[in-house]
Curated annotation (Swiss-Prot):
Its job: Cellular uptake of iron occurs via receptor-mediated endocytosis of ligand-occupied transferrin receptor into specialized endosomes. Endosomal acidification leads to iron release. The apotransferrin-receptor complex is then recycled to the cell surface with a return to neutral pH and the concomitant loss of affinity of apotransferrin for its receptor. Transferrin receptor is necessary for development of erythrocytes and the nervous system. Upon stimulation, positively regulates T and B cell proliferation through iron uptake.
Motif (Cell attachment site): 649-651
Localization of this protein: Cell membrane; Melanosome
GO terms classed as biological process: acute-phase response; cellular response to iron ion; cellular response to leukemia inhibitory factor; cellular response to xenobiotic stimulus; intracellular iron ion homeostasis; intracellular signal transduction; multicellular organismal-level iron ion homeostasis; negative regulation of apoptotic process
Modification Phosphotyrosine occurs at: Y20
Covalent lipid sites (S-palmitoyl cysteine): C67
Residue ranges annotated as Cytoplasmic topological domain: 1-67
PA domain residues: 225-315
Protein name: Transferrin receptor protein 1
TM helices/strands, residue ranges: 68-88
Highest taxon in the source lineage: Eukaryota
Residues where Phosphoserine is found: S10, S19, S24
Length: 763
């Protein structure tokens, strides 16, 4: 046996006798390399038995080198294998212990799949998701849901009423059925104004002899009117815009004014009238703009020039908050009341002077009440505290759950009419929530970011529910919510598609308009390459407005409509039947609105980069600079220069260019790098909120879209005043406006630049 083993071992190395040679590492003085040859003991025994003298044989160099090469190869293979194996074990050691080296390759592979916690579903692409969304929407009957929400079960549903709460609970249950990640409610205690159950609001003509001629005890009312009694001359002021008041040939000082509904909000009409020293306002729907058959139709609205609970300005209306009594500066100090067209025509019968042709108004319109007559207005509205509920459901993102898009709709309404005002938006909200729930649970859609669906109430009192939620999370919401999509009043007609949005969303909306087809003519919604110039500014009565102007969150609102206003909003005729009569293709129109909103949601939550085009504000800043350049002489006369404003605008342009370059150079698969870039993009809108005014005193701090002396439009208006009436111009105010606007723009540029060491400090 020993002979066989020795023979096999010997043959492995070419049949040569084995010897090991040790070479000295030190070079010998005489140039020789000494070595020691060692023979195996078995060889020595064999030589001794055969009585043969061992002779030293020189090993063959070729076979020796082959031996060392083989050994080296084996060693390197083992080192590489062990390094890789130990590295793998280290990665998964938290899950389970390393597998033994002796296990098969198949076992290693199967255990690798078990221990790696990586989603196995394939990622759907934009084209796949568009098709999937379209197919889902095709199977839904939106009109049935709108009809259900417009029935007596849920109407009338004034904010805080029993039927409003019943609808809130229904929506909450629906969200639970959709298997959302979380469903919750937000509770507030707010003060709203309602008609008195004791006294009536009244409009009366006071004859010269003191006799009273009753005109109307209106069914409708205007919330947040000053409850008081006034009497005076009555004059017409068209729509009640600032321009309308400026163009009047008679004074409104100490007079009641009557204005048409439309063009601007009730609150703006009242504020304008108050600024021209009017003592009260009457609002009606004229026949030309609102061709409604019923002349005695009542109208509802509110007069708060702001949003949220006006008795807790700047802070949320949570129960038992210990704030001192206060009220919003946007509340009017004069009474305001809506009247029917029949009542307005009765008043016109006592008035004189034809209305200007440029007003494009019906012939019954008159300008001033006859001499020796007055109109008496009595408003007896009362404040009520109501508990209101906002309902939320969230689909959490799979990569960045702490970043979310909010999709919301108002569910309440003043009066019995609810269809176009709140049922369409609420129905669309529910169906979109259902569609996205199905896409995730059944079709493999994995949004990177979260989607929050929100049902607001008290929207008819000035986006109270939405604003109170924003006020409750003012310090943190802008760091997490990056877009608000408003679904209110999305279908009022078929002819036009109108958009109101933050400039950050213009580019994305343009792409979606090119994708989505109009259901009537089959053409793209993108009809005009110059559509951005026709984008309308968000109004006070739009729930998207406080998101943009108060919280600095990009927001978008859109609708299908006609050239003329929808005639039934704010009236009891806003019914499902009236809506389907005006919009026979209601189901197709709402489905198209759902496709627009759905594509927005997908693009904002699916793509690696946030689809917010921060470069669009470059054109807005450039437009502002052009407006300001018209007053270069005035500015120079005050010893001022626009140099620093130019510099701030230039820094913003350079910051956007650098950010675009950073994005193009970034490794898109590196989530940490992309998150850092997206965080910089998210800061843009928020940093356009002026940091130099109080959110309590001036809640709408956005220098482009806000309201107050800190806005860029107010700065320009101040310069116009200097040219018109220099004695009324406040130079100190203007200097502050210019300085603070400059530093606000510079702050946005700095935020876009990223880390503090990347900011150009040579301002």
């Amino acid at each position: 046996m020993m002979d066989q083993a020795r023979s096999a071992f010997s043959n492995l190395f070419g049949g040569e006798p084995l010897s090991y040679t040790r070479f000295s590492l030190a070079r010998q003085v005489d140039g020789d390399n000494s070595h020691v040859e060692m023979k195996l003991a078995a060889d020595e025994e064999e030589n001794a038995d055969n009585n043969m003298k061992a002779s030293v044989r020189k090993p063959k160099r070729f076979n020796g080198r082959l031996c060392f090469a083989a050994i080296a190869l084996v060693i390197f293979f083992l080192i590489g294998f062990m390094s890789g194996y130990l590295g793998y074990c280290k990665r998964v050691e938290q899950k389970e212990e390393c597998v033994k080296l002796a296990e098969t390759e198949e076992t290693d592979k199967s255990e690798t799949m078990e221990t790696e916690d990586v989603p196995t579903s394939s990622r759907l692409y934009w084209a796949d998701l568009k098709t999937l969304l379209s197919e889902k929407l095709n199977s839904i009957e939106f009109a049935d849901t709108i009809k259900q929400l417009s029935q007596n079960t849920y109407t009338p549903r004034e904010a805080g009423s029993q039927k409003d709460e019943s609808l809130a609970y229904y929506i909450e249950n629906q969200f639970h059925e959709f298997k959302f990640s979380k469903v919750w409610r937000d509770e507030h205690y707010v003060k709203i104004q309602v008609k008195s159950s004791i006294g009536q609001n009244m409009v009366t003509i006071v004859q010269s002899n003191g006799n009273l001629d009753p005109v109307e005890s209106p069914e409708g009312y205007v919330a947040f009117s000053k409850p008081t009694e006034v009497s005076g001359k009555l004059v017409h002021a068209n729509f009640g815009t600032k321009k309308d008041f400026e163009e009047l040939s008679y004074s409104v000082n100490g007079s009641l004014v009557i204005v048409r509904a439309g063009e601007i909000t009730f609150a703006e009409k009242v504020a304008n009238a108050q600024s021209f020293n009017a003592i009260g306002v009457l609002i009606y729907m004229d026949k030309n703009k609102f061709p409604v058959v019923e002349a005695d139709l009542a109208l509802f609205g509110h007069a708060h020039l702001g949003t949220g609970d006006p008795y807790t300005p700047g802070f949320p209306s949570f129960n038992h908050t210990q704030f001192p009594p206060s009220q919003s500066s946007g509340l009017p100090n004069i009474p305001v009341q809506t009247i029917s067209r029949a009542a307005a025509e009765k008043l016109f019968g006592k008035m004189e002077g034809s209305c200007p042709a440029r007003w494009n108004i019906d012939s019954s319109c008159k300008l001033e009440l006859s001499q020796n007559q007055n109109v008496k207005l009595i408003v007896k509205n009362v404040l009520k505290e109501r508990r209101i509920l906002n309902i939320f459901g969230v689909i959490k993102g799979y990569e960045e759950p702490d970043r979310y898009v909010v999709v919301g709709a108002q569910r309440d309404a003043l009066g019995a009419g609810v269809a176009a005002k709140s049922s369409v938006g609420t129905g669309l909200l529910l169906k979109l929530a259902q569609v996205f729930s199905d896409m995730i649970s059944k079709d493999g859609f994995r949004p990177s970011r979260s989607i929050i669906f929100a049902s607001w109430t008290a929207g008819d009192f000035g986006a109270v529910g939405a604003t109170e939620w924003l006020e409750g999370y003012l310090s943190s919401l802008h760091l997490k919510a990056f877009t608000y999509i408003n679904l209110d009043k999305v279908v009022l007609g078929t002819s036009n598609f109108k958009v109101s949005a933050s400039p950050l969303l213009y580019t994305l909306m343009g792409k979606i308009m090119q994708d989505v087809k109009h259901p009537v003519d089959g053409k793209s919604l993108y009809r005009d390459s110059n559509w951005i110039s026709k984008v309308e500014k968000l109004s006070f009565d739009n729930a998207a407005y406080p998101f943009l102007a108060y919280s600095g969150i990009p927001a978008v609102s859109f609708c299908f409509c006609e050239d003329a206003d929808y005639p039934y909003l704010g009236t009891r005729l806003d019914t499902y039947e009236a809506l389907t009569q005006k919009v026979p293709q209601l189901n197709q129109m709402v489905r198209t609105a759902a496709e627009v909103a759905g594509q927005l949601i997908i693009k904002l939550t699916h793509d690696v980069e946030l689809n917010l085009d921060y470069e669009m504000y470059n054109s807005k800043l450039l437009s502002f600079m052009k407006d300001l350049n018209q007053f270069k002489t005035d500015i120079r006369d005050m010893g001022l220069s626009l140099q620093w404003l130019y510099s701030a605008r230039g820094d913003y342009f350079r910051a956007t260019s650098r950010l675009t370059t950073d994005f193009h150079n970034a490794e898109k698969t590196n989530r940490f790098v992309m998150r850092e870039i997206n965080d910089r993009i998210m800061k843009v809108e928020y940093h356009f909120l002026s940091p130099y005014v109080s959110p309590r005193e001036s809640p709408f701090r956005h220098i482009f879209w806000g309201s107050g002396s800190h806005t860029l439009s107010a700065l320009v208006e101040n310069l116009k005043l200097r040219q018109k009436n220099i004695t009324a111009f406040n130079e100190t105010l203007f200097r502050n406006q210019l300085a603070l606007a400059t530093w606000t723009i510079q702050g946005v540029a700095n935020a876009l630049s990223g880390d503090i060491w990347n900011i150009d400090n040579e301002f």
